[in-house]
Amino acid sequence: MDYRRLRMPDFDAIPRRDYLMAVLSGVLLALSFPSPGISPLAWIAFAPLLLACGRKDPRKAFRLGFVTGLAAYAGILYWITIVVTTYGKLPWIVSVGVLSMLVSYLALYPAVVAYLVRRGEERGISLLISFPLLWVGLEYGRAFLVTGFPWASLGYTQYRTLPLIQIADITGVYGLSFLIALANVVLFRIIRGFAAREPAPYPVKSVVLLLVLLLVTIAYGFKRLHVPEGGAPFKVALIQGNIDQNIKWDPSFQEETVAIYERLSRKACAAGPSDLLVWPESAAPFYFQDEPRYASRIKGLARELKTCAVVGSPAFEKDGERLKYLNSAFLLSPWGDVIGRSDKIHLVPFGEYVPMAKLLPFVNKLVAGIGDFSPGAQIAALDTGKGRIGILVCFEGIFPELSRAYVRAGSRLLVNITNDAWFGRSSAPYQHISMTVFRAVENRVPLVRAANTGITSIIDSRGHIRGMTPLFQEAVLNGEVRLGEGESFYNRYGDVFAWACVAGAAVVAALAFRRKSIHHQ
């Protein structure tokens, strides 16, 4: 074998300026997500990368796209190191390793987009078509591949721009991702035209197409924002206990934990009657079914306050000879009876279970202490007597298909209970809430959110955050929402737009691998 032919990639073949441009794209993309959440940057973030990739070999474009992905996702997901080091009690070098592996995996997506875009350009496929289709197609694929990780989809950068995000009730978040990707291509064409000093550098047709799509999107948004919410009024009281993660599961602290939630619940309901009291994920740090002393106190509290209550607590049930452990929420009636339970369906990999544990038994030894939870078996809309609710536990709120399923099952209010204490005072809680805003708009139902350490919030069916609490403070949040009708194109037909982009991306990829025509050689 001729080992002289085995060479490392020639990174020097790409000018340093182009690498800096790729890094700049990643930095701009990271800054567009919360926090700091400078959302306009998303509309220009890819222009430096596209300029760097111009007329380059597709393999070099792949490297540049990978560099952009590394810079972007390292900036967005840096908080992974906080979770692993501070709460996982693992050495910092392990946390950096975990972050590096995740970021490297995610960076493959923009790398593949850059590669296919350049191959497509060499075969006459317009960037105006290929880039938005490939970006959205792969972004949608990322939501399902390798357990699914739809965190930081491009459209989420615009969660506070209400006129823009109303289109999500038709296209989901992916419609905005498509529009942002398209805008970046148009900007790139304008810059390239002026830089090349072409006689007619202004891409008139591209600009007109973009402006028409933007105007239609914004006009639709303003129209939807002026449609009054017609559902029945429903009062909620949300409790933020601010229980320190380091003592949360300490049995000696259970009494104080329950007392904190009792005190805050009475404070919330003293401000006025409530139809639903909501405690966060695992607010009751014990098995609600198997701890009569504290469970009876919580049931008594619901009777005292004359309200339905959602209480986050682990649960268990028999599955043949073994016990299944579940991350659950119990619904209590105003009479203190348990009238429903919702179990978490989409578990956190390496947080609540170990993927492929049976095939890779050695992994369990490497991650000792990881929870051994089982996923819930069914989507259940729980009836409060005044309206049905769908409960999303923890990061289930980032999966559009779960919220859609709960609403299709009859839920008229989505309730997200979570414990974001793991994230510390990082960007992660803000990124988390930005995604739940879209679940309300997509399904045209309000969403209320109770988080152990924040951000607790009330979001109406238009995506307007009507109230939110600060991080790491005890807090109560009272408010009134209008129960949704759950009638939207997205709720009825799902990710039709995203699937159309997947199909378009597949066609682009197929054409990109065809033999070059003589005209383009």
Curated annotation (Swiss-Prot):
GO terms for biological process: lipoprotein biosynthetic process. Pathway: Protein modification; lipoprotein biosynthesis (N-acyl transfer). The active site is at E281 (proton acceptor), K344, C394 (nucleophile). This is Apolipoprotein N-acyltransferase. GO terms for cellular component: plasma membrane. Gene3D superfamilies: Carbon-nitrogen hydrolase. Pfam families: CN_hydrolase, LNT_N. GO terms for molecular function: N-acyltransferase activity. SUPFAM superfamilies: Carbon-nitrogen hydrolase. It is a multi-pass membrane protein. It comes from the Bacteria. The chain crosses the membrane at residues 27-47, 64-84, 93-113, 125-145, 167-187, 202-222, 493-513.
